[in-house]
Curated annotation (Swiss-Prot):
The gene is aglA. It comes from Aspergillus niger (strain ATCC MYA-4892 / CBS 513.88 / FGSC A1513). InterPro entries: Aldolase_TIM, Glyco_hydro_27, Glyco_hydro_27/36_CS, Glyco_hydro_b, Glycoside_hydrolase_SF, Melibiase_C, Ricin_B-like_lectins, Ricin_B_lectin. This is Probable alpha-galactosidase A. One of its GO terms (biological process) is carbohydrate metabolic process. Hydrolyzes a variety of simple alpha-D-galactoside as well as more complex molecules such as oligosaccharides and polysaccharides. Its EC number is 3.2.1.22. It comes from the Eukaryota. Pfam families: Melibiase_2, Melibiase_C, Ricin_B_lectin. Disulfide bonds join C46-C78, C126-C156, C430-C444, C469-C482. The active site is at D154 (nucleophile), D212 (proton donor).
Length: 537
């Protein structure tokens, strides 16, 4: 089958998928809000044992983490024996876990926690232990018998079988696990690591293809590189920023019942400053990403416990709307992100990526607040202080610090239009409006000309020129007066595949000279990030 035919068939398949249906048993109630808890990997890797987990459960129950919502304790790789039993069942390492995993499950449950486990979709785990390939039903039943309700399924040692591409092989294996879990009386939470094995290449097509199907099969997906482990070489902050940047490319996939997972929180990593640790937590909270701590819990400091149990930020993370914060603006120094919250409030998160303190005024119009003569209440979610703002909010941020504000919208001022960057996810370039009605893709520079409003009817207009609308005519794209007779040319739909399709031309926006071309499946030049809250077609 040639690539063109395959693209057409794949696009047709994606068009037929009911994107509101997610999760292992095709219901969002299995995991309506992101999970919170503990995993040993980034801190201890294979150096795990029974005592580590009992001490962790004891500490989390005593120091406020459990009561703050961190109610899951998950094993990672290296928990098992190197051989299955005579009947093919997995066995735990009896030296590391002398009382056994069923006993450990009972122990952590008695402390108020759920218990999760790790396996691999290949014939071996990443650490060289038995994988679940060809043992899926048996292993799922074993885990349930042991008292486990959460499965992280890795993707090491997966090889394409005859007649399948590697992406198709992963889809078959994770799809089979989805079927197995769906038949269980009490399905396990399904954390999929498949996308991580396709991230970071020169072409994102396979990565996005995997991202298209993981939300249908499970509740969360590890989408990119592992966070730096405690003993690893390199910069922990750079590792956090790497995973943060990957996560910003994927907001269109997230909704209640499915969550993008940029990997663990590492609050006791010695390579991080206090501001960097707090930023890590605040950014993941703003994303409504899983909050899974990988640290030596008994030794966490009071300050680390304090920010990890920040009620206001946890409330944002656990907000039932489950929107992922997206870029309102970005330049080389500041990232400004925003999203809606279920009660109608608006979130503002600002990250200083630079190496010096920055002061900036941020117009409320950049945050999607379009009403004039309104006064909003802005609550600082770090210290609880509030201030009244009207046309802008002033931010002062130290290097690598993150500010988070919750904006209350008074009656009569509650109108919000999804607002922010329209950027190509492969190049990172931002759609930019010019004063001569032309548009171009340029490096993101924090200018108002790169900030766009996207209305419910599919109209896209720059905040710098709100009487002008993005329009397509033939192969060209330009700005023209809104509400003109060419309304179809100003109407756009946004798909989960990242395509921005025009109603008049039936083509898709394409980076380059900013033009319309035939819509292709997950092609780099046609995959765009838009503000959260934009309706998917």
């Amino acid at each position: 089958m040639n690539q063109g035919t395959k693209s057409i068939l794949l696009a047709a398949t994606l068009a037929a998928i009911p994107w509101q249906v997610y999760g292992s048993i095709e219901q969002s109630s299995l995991l309506p809000i992101p999970p919170m808890g503990f995993n040993n990997w980034a801190r201890f890797m294979c150096d795990l044992n029974e005592t580590l987990f009992t001490e962790t459960a004891d500490a989390m129950a005593a120091n406020g983490l459990r009561d703050a919502g961190y109610n899951r304790i998950n094993l990672d790789d290296c928990w098992m024996a190197y051989q299955r039993s005579d009947n093919g069942s997995l066995q735990w390492n009896t030296t590391k876990f002398p009382h056994g995993l069923p006993w450990l499950a009972q122990y952590v449950k008695a402390k108020g926690f759920h218990f999760g486990i790790y396996e691999d979709s290949g014939n071996m785990t990443c650490g060289g232990y038995p994988g679940s390939y060809n043992h899926e039903e048996q292993d799922a039943n074993t885990f349930a018998l042991w008292g486990i309700d959460y499965l992280k399924l890795d993707g090491c040692n997966v090889y394409a079988t005859q007649g399948r591409t590697l992406e198709e092989e992963y889809k078959q294996r994770y799809g089979h696990w989805h079927q197995v879990l769906s038949k269980m009386q009490h399905p396990l939470i399904f954390s999929e690591s498949a996308p991580a094995y396709f991230a970071g290449t020169d072409n994102n097509t396979d990565w996005y293809t995997v991202m298209d199907w993981v939300p249908i099969y499970g509740e969360l997906a590890r989408h990119s590189t592992d966070i730096l482990v405690y003993s690893g070489a390199g910069s922990a902050w750079d590792s956090i920023m790497n995973n943060y940047n990957y996560n910003t490319l994927l907001a269109r996939y997230q909704r209640p019942g499915y969550f993008n997972d940029p990997d663990f929180l590492i609050p006791d990593h010695p390579g991080l400053t206090a501001d960097e640790k707090r930023s890590h937590f605040a950014l993941w909270a703003s994303f409504s990403a899983p909050l899974i701590i990988s640290a030596y819990i008994p030794a966490l400091s009071k300050d680390e416990i304090a920010f990890l149990t920040n009620e206001a930020l946890i409330a944002v993370n656990q907000d039932p709307l489950a929107q992922q914060a997206t870029f309102a603006s970005r330049d080389n120094t500041l990232d400004i992100l925003t999203r809606n919250l279920a009660n109608g409030d608006r979130l503002l998160t600002v990250l200083n990526k630079g190496n010096t303190t920055v002061t900036r005024d941020i117009p409320v119009q950049w945050l999607g607040l379009t009403e004039t003569d309104c006064t909003y209440t802005a609550e600082d979610l770090w210290d609880g202080k509030t201030q009244k703002i009207s046309d802008h909010i002033k931010i002062e941020l130290a290097s690598h610090a993150t500010a988070v504000f919750r904006l209350g919208l008074p009656q009569g001022c509650s109108s919000v239009v999804p607002t922010g960057l329209v950027f190509n996810t492969a190049s990172g370039n931002c759609l930019t409006a010019a004063s001569n009605s032309s548009v171009a893709f340029q490096s993101c520079n924090g200018e108002t000309s790169q900030i766009w409003q996207v209305t419910l009817s599919g109209v896209i207009r720059p905040v710098s020129q709100t009487t002008q609308c993005l329009a397509a005519d033939g192969n060209s794209v330009k700005l023209q007066a809104c509400d003109s007779t060419d309304s179809d040319g100003q109407n756009w739909t946004y798909a989960v595949t990242g395509n921005l399709k025009n109603a008049k031309t039936d083509g898709c926006l394409t980076e380059g000279s900013v033009q319309m071309k035939s819509c292709l499946y997950e092609r780099d030049g046609q995959v765009f990030g838009l503000p959260s809250g934009v309706q998917l077609s």
